[in-house]
Every structure is written in C-alpha cells, then in structure tokens.
C-alpha cells in the first residue's frame, strides 16, 4: 500500500476523532541589539528527524539575528528527556522549549513548573494564535484533564505496519494486499519465517508502551483506568491479555522478533525482517536507509473491532523563567509551527502536522 494513501487515511481518521503564521520580527530586541539565547530540548536522534531539527534551528537563527537557539538531543526518547528535565530544573537550569511526549502530559503537568502558554502568547502580543490556528480537539491533545493548556501540539503520530514487499513476494504474500487484522499478521509472520528464513514481525518497545496501548485498546482493553479519582493500571483484563498474547505467540513460534528498537529497525532496513509496527514518524528514515521500496498499511484490527489509536508524537512546552527568554521561546514556537517549518518537519520525519489548513 502506498505511503501517501496511509498518510491520508491516518490523518483523516486521527484529526476527525482527536483532530498543518509567519515568523515574527522580534522588533523589540532588534531595537536594543540584545541577543537572547534559548535552549531547545528534543528527542530527535539522527535516525529520527535529528537532521531536520538542525536545519530548522539553523534557519530560525539565520532569520532571527537577535535570538540564538541551541538545540539539545535527549537519548532514550521521552523517558530520558523527562529524567534530564527533572535534574536540570532541580539545579535551576531550565531549558526554554521542550518536546514533551503526549503520554507524559499529566506527569509533566503535575511535576514541572511550566510557563502558561495563554499568558505567554498574550505577553508576546499574539493571544489568539492558538485559537486561530488549531482546531479545539487538536489543542486538547496538549491539555490536562481539567482543561489546562500546558503545551502546543507539534508532532502527531499514528502507529502503522511497515513491510518489505520483496520479502512478501518471496513468502508468496501479496504486497498489494497487506495484513489488515492481527490474525492475518500472525499468519503472514509465520509464512515469512517458514518460506524465507527471515523474521516475520517486530513491534517497537519504547518505554511509553504507545503501540502496546493501541494494541490493547483496539481489542477492547484499557491501559489505564480511574478508580475513586485515582488513575491506576487497567490492563489486567482478558481483552488486554488476549491482545498481548498475539505478539507473545509470534515470539514463541520464532516468527516474532523480541529485541531492542534499534535492533528491530536495523533488521527491517537490512532486509531480514518482513514487518515492523512503529510510528509513521519513522517513514523518512526507513525510506532513506532501506534498499527496497518501503511500504506501509494502517494499524491492524482485531477482527471487526474498530481500531483505537492513542495520539502519539509530542507537544511543545515552555519552561523559561526570564521574561525575555519567554518571548524568544514563543517566537521560536511560532516558527516551528509555521506551515513552512511544519512541511519540512513532516517531510523529514513522517509526522502529521497539527495546524488547520
């Protein structure tokens, strides 16, 4: 299945249920000649949009001579970033703009002293920026349960099933008719292993358990539940167990790969793995690194049950304590969220853009 069709389908479904401004002139700093330096923390490794981050930062710095953005990559995705953020804030060395994963939203709201974006945009003279450029249900992606807007949606991701059409053909599978259900994925994985000797399937295993959440909830289970006002683990159910069993059975019969993320992704890129379930944000890296035509299909379903996909990706938070740094941070965020910059980010990663129009 062509990736353009997958992108179109996933964007429509995601933005329908949970839902792509020009750069400012920074006139005040231009008048004073003062240069403000801010830090931008992200999780984009070189294989996951890192080059695009550097390109965007360089472009912003070139067009905003009175602001200097210094980017910092944080390993181990959002778990590593959150740990580093805790340490930095404990020592009083706040970064200014941070990519925060949606799955860490409530934790960030409860444990970090962040800058109120509504107040920050108002102070920057653009209090209607969020309302004018984002659908209400998209803004909700970066809101707490009580409606606090703690950040601005930036990267919107969905899990998809990438596959190698050459391995499919060798296994007598039709690349134009990829698996649509988990039963079909299991059968295809076994067929790939039996006929080609290659591993059949791998599911990303990041610490936030995002794809596992999609797996569980698509089978009628829950990752979390609320009891007496407190959020607790909710995956101890028959539906959740049955969902996990699908992947466990593939590993048990030798057709499923249980490995680190980098090992799994490299197996796919090197032509030793038939299918990998991961974020659409890996698209650009896969297309660049693979020697075969990368193909993808939507996240598989459990029979006729509707798939339930939690929003993945990240939103932008501001932690600046200094007023001038806050203004510079907002200027940088407006640039990152501009149609031109979002187009570069989407092309360099595969993420879906959050803006209207």
Language-model regions, residue ranges each:
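Extracytoplasmic/periplasmic substrate-recognition and gating elements
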Residues: 62-63, 68, 91, 169-171, ...
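Hinge/lid segment of periplasmic solute-binding proteins
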Residues: 102-158, 186, 194-196, 214-215, ...
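Short, well-ordered beta-strand elements
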Residues: 33-46, 67-72, 97, 150
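Short, low-complexity disordered leader/linker segments with a strong preference
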Residues: 1-39, 62, 123
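Glycine-centered hinge/linker elements that transmit conformational signals in sensory
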Residues: 186-191, 229-258
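Extracytoplasmic "Venus flytrap"/periplasmic binding protein-like
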Residues: 59, 63-134, 170-172, 274-275, ...
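Extracytoplasmic/periplasmic solute-binding protein
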Residues: 144-154, 159, 169, 183-232, ...
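Short, solvent-exposed loop/beta-turn-alpha elements that line the ligand-binding surface or hinge
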Residues: 118-134, 178, 195, 201, ...
